[in-house]
Amino acid sequence: MNLMINLKPLTFLPFFGRLVFLSGVIYNTAWANTVIPVDNSRPDETFSQTSPKQHLFSQKPKPTEPTSSASSQQISLTIEQLASRPDLVLRALIPALKNNDMRGVEILLPIYAKQSPDPFLLKWAQAVVARKQGKLNESVRLYRQIIAEKPNLQPARLQLAIALTQNRENEAAKAQFNQLRSENLPAPLLTLIDSYIDTINQRDSWNVYGGVNYLHENNVNNAPPKGTKAEGFTPSSQPEKAHGLSYFINLSKNWSLAHGFFTEFSADINGKYYWDNHKYDEFSTRLNLGGGYRNAKTEVKLMPFVEQFWYVGGENATKDARTLHRYSKSSGINLDVDYWLTPNWKISTVLEYTEQRYIQPQRQNSNGNSYSISNTLIYMPNSQQFWFVGLDYYQKNTRLKAYAFERQGIRLGWGQEWPKGISTRLQTSYATRTYRAPSAEKNMIFAPSFFKVVQKNHEYGVNFTIWHRSLHWLGITPKITWAYQKTTSNNPFSEYDRNRIYLTFSKTF
């Protein structure tokens, strides 16, 4: 058997890469003698906001894969002759790997494996051959190890993205393709990536994404620090610890229509279970049905939704309470717009309107609606890094004005792929929250003075996540997150610090 070998210099020419990494205390107007109840029974409030997201990507018809088109000096050798020339094997293997020549790699791998091979090149060749032979799980596993070791090796990242697409790992595939777009690529390669994204967007398969977090809470009820005292009054709440699990499941399906339009259904389930403090257990469901338009650079989605929330009761519940009760119901509409300004810059905008109704009579003064607007600008200078800045506005209108407020915030973030397979993500945030009215009338005798003025809060947050890219088990990568929240206020009973540690296991099916 004769083999035509391309003789090229022993250099790696990167042309790709990137992974888009992509509470308020509710207080009562109570006027007890010296103990002022601090109502922390409501679960954490969440605010619609965009942040770097890893979008779902998959493919239908397969775009043409990149292969070598260069004309080089060629020689004809038999397998036996090639086996006696390790230098030629290496000079042939490297271009074959870089240029996605799966047939050439398949021929060269058995020869190279017997010649004191470089472990990295051997693993890369094994990944290519596994993909050619349809062993996609094995191929993806090997490619992830390769990228963890050399995150700037763009040809291998492209091959990983294609393997993920073929393996119908939609979210992961789209994330890798979006990373690759951030590089200064030749026009044909950008066209190739866009063709993959376009065909992936036309997939109509069900997507399931879920995960479990281990929670370690030192102040699950957002209470002021122990020993807080003001004007002779003390809060009724003290920080409580809790340990447990949070869980989430997202089920979604798209139906592609003509000219880039689509309809979409999704269902979200979220919950928290604390085995040593059950009164803070919670559970929620949200159903979304809508549609939109998308192409390789733009996605616009309008999604009406309904939501139900169950809660044991928090501080309003007895110590041994365990039963979840209907807490609130909501309905509204969400508009989500993503647009790539350039291959390196992306802007994401989310607008949401919600009508919320509380089930328990004593909570119905909180009935009302809310508006939120969130904008995030994302910059990806290369395949190993991203930066983002976000601006958020949230307005809550309630029957009782003392519960209504406006919140304005800013977020800054940075994600990085480091050598040795380590990845990190850091986000810092700052927000101001201003309530519409005081929680106590000025002529109320048994209330502290700070209840008689409009409450203003300053809210600070830090989130840091770290994981190892090559640590995978059944497609799951464990991640560790530390989250810190601090609120200062002109109401000392609304000030608190909160440290949380998460251990996250998530997977896309």
Curated annotation (Swiss-Prot):
Signal peptide annotation: 1-32
Polar residues bias: start-end ranges: 46-57
Subcellular location: Cell outer membrane
Topology within the bilayer: Multi-pass membrane protein
Entry keyword set: Cell outer membrane, Membrane, Signal, TPR repeat, Transmembrane, Transmembrane beta strand
TPR repeat placement: 120-153
Ranges for region C-terminal probable beta barrel: 205-509
InterPro entries given in the database record: Slam_C_b-barrel, TPR-like_helical_dom_sf
Parts of the chain that traverse the membrane: 206-216, 245-256, 261-270, 284-294, 298-308, 331-341, 345-355, 371-381, 386-395, 408-417, 423-432, 461-470, 476-485, 499-509
Disordered as annotated region, ranges: 43-72
Keyword set includes Membrane: yes
One cellular-component annotation, GO: cell outer membrane
Positions of the UniProt region annotated as N-terminal domain: 33-204
Pfam families named among the record's database cross-references: SlipAM (PF04575), TPR_Slam (PF24575)
Domain statement: Consists of a soluble N-terminal domain and C-terminal probable beta-barrel in the outer membrane with 14 predicted beta-strands.
Stated family: Belongs to the Slam family.
Summary of the function given for this chain in its UniProt record: Required for correct export to the cell surface of some cell outer membrane lipoproteins (tested with PM1514) upon heterologous expression in E.coli and probably also in Pasteurella.
Protein's name according to its UniProt entry: Surface lipoprotein assembly modifier
Organism expressing this protein natively: Pasteurella multocida (strain Pm70)
